[in-house]
Amino acid sequence: MHDATAGTAASHHDDAGRAATDAEPVRRAAVVIHPGKHDDLDGFRAAVGKAMSDLGWAEPLWLETRPDDTGERLAQEAVRSGVDLVLASGGDGTITACVSGVAGSGVPLGVLPCGTGNLLARNLGLPLSLDEALAVALTGSDRRLDVGAANGRPFVVMAGIGFDAEMLGGADERLKSRVGWAAYVLSALRHLRERPVRMALRADGGPPQRRWASGVIVGNVGSLQGNVRLLPDAVPDDGILDVAVLAASGWTGWLWLAADVLLRRKTGRVAHLTCRELTVQAGRARPWEVDGEVAGTTRQLRVTLEPGCLLVRVPAGNDG
């Protein structure tokens, strides 16, 4: 009787040991957060913590951006710590900085959008509400995306030189918080009289194509603020950059160009091309931007592409 009891106890101990060994390890995420983008930071932290706890995730690693680190080094730190997922919560600039930190690591990026543009989220069909975005980030599928680089700075949405950078740089921050993407429209109106600049475009090392241009936009995805589909054929995982060359001046010229884009008309005001590498040489220094962040002025914009180097968490079944 004693032997049978001992044997039973030993058997139960072995079963418990196997269960512990076979149990799935507790997952942990890092949250890179731009505190200035949140009106209720404590409420945000509580909502994220509860969502993770409800799904059996460990308490997240919290990392706040600073003026000297908008997210890239923080995301790298998170990857080195061994997390299973990096969540980025902020505007497009924060998302792009985190992309730079996790690209090529094999650790997926989850997006918790809270900025004005939210262009990556909108182009990938990601939800904008926190609860839904958390559900996708914690239970969705991973999609492998291309990452571009403009003058060495990574982007996943778009980079550009000329008019779009002027528009982005001129948008008032307080107005953006009140009226959203319409602030960019108001900024654009102030630059309609700018005359096109002579530019030379060299795609994939080919001969230069010289033309007058107000701006050149290079995209990994197709939609701008307001869901304007500037690059209708752009796909973020096809290994190809889509390019739009814009040429207009004055109210009338830009109205015609806007109509061309909305109606997808092929005219000299909007020219499209595709490539894997592009160099733009401008006749004079022009502002340039990456993923909605103005980077300064330059006469040359060199854009390259690294196919499939980024994993992004998307709704289940939407992984390409």
Short names for language-model regions:
Residues 1-86, 319-320:
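ATP/NTP phosphate-donor binding region
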Residues 2-7, 12-17, 203-205, 210, ...:
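ATP/nucleoside-binding phosphotransfer catalytic cores, i.e., glycine-rich phosphate-binding loops
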Residues 32, 42, 54-55, 65, ...:
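Catalytic core of DAGKc-family lipid kinases
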Residues 35, 89-91, 114:
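Glycine-rich beta-strand-to-loop/alpha-helix junction loops that act as flexible
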Residues 71, 93-98, 119:
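Short glycine/serine/threonine-rich phosphate/pyrophosphate-binding segments
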Residues 160, 164, 217-230, 294:
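Glycine-rich phosphate/pyrophosphate-binding beta-alpha loops
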Residues 175-183, 218, 226, 232-253:
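Gly/Ser/Thr-rich active-site loops/lids in small-molecule metabolic enzymes
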